[in-house]
Amino acid sequence: MQYSIETVLDIGNEEFYRAARYQIPLSVLLINSRDKNIFDVLEELLRPTDIIQQITHELIVVFLTHTNIENANTFVNNIKEHVNFSATVDEYKGFKVEFIENLFTDNQQTMKVS
């Protein structure tokens, strides 16, 4: 899990900085999916300012810039119309290491329930 946390921190470092500095919303999704079409769907729905990165074979992180938690949940529901997956969503509020650790912990608990 530590490797994944560090990877997400590296990928989103600039976005975490912008969100904190300019007080703009930033939501992060951890998506678990075996569906091979997930990237096609994400690329169709994401904006040019959003960031997508595959962390492991089944785990994808998505940074939704200028997006609060409500809009992030709407985005997740739009994806669910096209592919099967589980996801953890949260809005970044300021402490990046703790934020990512909590996101991964919540994601692992979601996987145990699914």
Residue map of PLM features:
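Regulatory and interdomain segments flanking nucleotide-handling catalytic cores
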Residues: M1-S114
